[in-house]
Amino acid sequence: MAGRGKTLGSGSAKKATTRSSKAGLQFPVGRIARFLKKGKYAERVGAGAPVYLAAVLEYLAAEVLELAGNAARDNKKTRIVPRHIQLAVRNDEELSKLLGDVTIANGGVMPNIHNLLLPKKTGASKPSAEDD
């Protein structure tokens, strides 16, 4: 039966390479492709679409994690908690616009004191008119 299928034990088997590693990504391209196909977003899904989507998701995740890590470090913490993610997202103009309608669980609120509630400035900034 020579010539049919693979022969046992001859030669080295080629190691499978994932589409994520080919694209240099950490996010799973194959899983995203499966979700796109199962979700019935379109009748057909191109080969580059899941790669592009995985790259975009990875970039957004890295951006949020970097800003949240900075917020955690500013608060002298070594662990990122939802509060740090909330502070990171709301302090960044573009991320705040993108995630404007998103509620982050246990994120708290942004610290804000209305200007009318702040104490009045009573400094000698203007010279008085009583010297005349």
Curated annotation (Swiss-Prot):
Core component of nucleosome. Nucleosomes wrap and compact DNA into chromatin, limiting DNA accessibility to the cellular machineries which require DNA as a template. Histones thereby play a central role in transcription regulation, DNA repair, DNA replication and chromosomal stability. DNA accessibility is regulated via a complex set of post-translational modifications of histones, also called histone code, and nucleosome remodeling. Residues 1-22 are annotated as: Disordered. Low level of expression; mainly in roots. Found in the root cap cells and in non dividing tissues of the plant, including the root elongation and maturation zones and the leaf veins. It holds the Pfam family Histone. The nucleosome is a histone octamer containing two molecules each of H2A, H2B, H3 and H4 assembled in one H3-H4 heterotetramer and two H2A-H2B heterodimers. The octamer wraps approximately 147 bp of DNA. This is Probable histone H2A.1. InterPro entries: Histone-fold, Histone_H2A, Histone_H2A/H2B/H3, Histone_H2A_C, Histone_H2A_CS. The keyword Plastid does not apply. It comes from the Eukaryota. One of its GO terms (molecular function) is structural constituent of chromatin. GO terms for cellular component: nucleolus; nucleosome; nucleus; plant-type cell wall. Not ubiquitinated. It is found in: Nucleus; Chromosome. Keywords: Chromosome, DNA-binding, Nucleosome core, Nucleus. The keyword Cell membrane does not apply. Belongs to the histone H2A family. Its main location: nucleus. The lineage of its organism: Eukaryota, Viridiplantae, Streptophyta, Embryophyta, Tracheophyta.
